[in-house]
Amino acid sequence: GGVPLLGDTIYEVEDDMKTKRDTYADCVKYIVDECELAAKDLPVVFSGMNNGRATAGACKGLISRIRLYEASKLFNGSDFGTSTNCPKELIGHPNYDKERWKAAVDAALDVIKLNRYAIYTRHVEADGYNPGRSEPGWGFYAIFHNNDFGKVSDGAYVTYSNGSYCEMIFECRPGEGNQREALFGPPTCGGNGNGGYIYHDLVEQFPMKDGKKIGESDKYPYDPMKPAEGRDPRFANTVVWNGSVIMSGGDKDHVVYTHKGVGSTTDAFGSGTP
């Protein structure tokens, strides 16, 4: 909903700040206007060490998202805001207008027409221990591990002008390190559990290699005892299962065992573990 718009007003410590909320429509207009102004002074994309800074593409991407939300059922003539303390115009647009969907489409097209963003598709490992090895879905992996703030060193920039960054409109990148692995990795790989783990319901959403749901593919029959076989390549780059091979402490052949019982490790967990 709407918030107090301060604009370029500068307050001193003892000044009374504006606290009255502006309407939802005014807030949308303010965000869009500011992004349009900023986009005129920013490059479409950055590269190298400047990856992660705001760009014209990021401004247009934010406008696109704002316009999509604005046109959605939640804000476009919603039923929220029926009390005098919270009038509708603070929560969204009081009346539905289908032209807001046209504005959302146009905003999305503005991003597409930049011709700088694409799905980074590469099925050959570019670096690491096995450069040149066939690995379906390697491009999906590269998006999350390109921490050198440069282009993936595989000549991909010939096809993708900014390497694996071609898929990112606006990202926040930490420096090199193992923060992500510590949050989400298995305990034997240095994981601390603070980031949480994937749920089985989400695991089941990954299709088979032919795009069909598990249990519906004739070419890739699903075996619950071997859940990773025949799955979409993104499965192996997202999910850790019993028998996964993951880099750990320089060991590229480290095997993760999640089973309980004889020989179980700190990676083991029981049924129903959240």
Regions found by a protein language model. Give the residues of each.
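An aromatic- and glycine-enriched ligand-binding surface/loop that stacks and positions planar moieties
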Residues: E36, R53, G57-K60, R67-D267
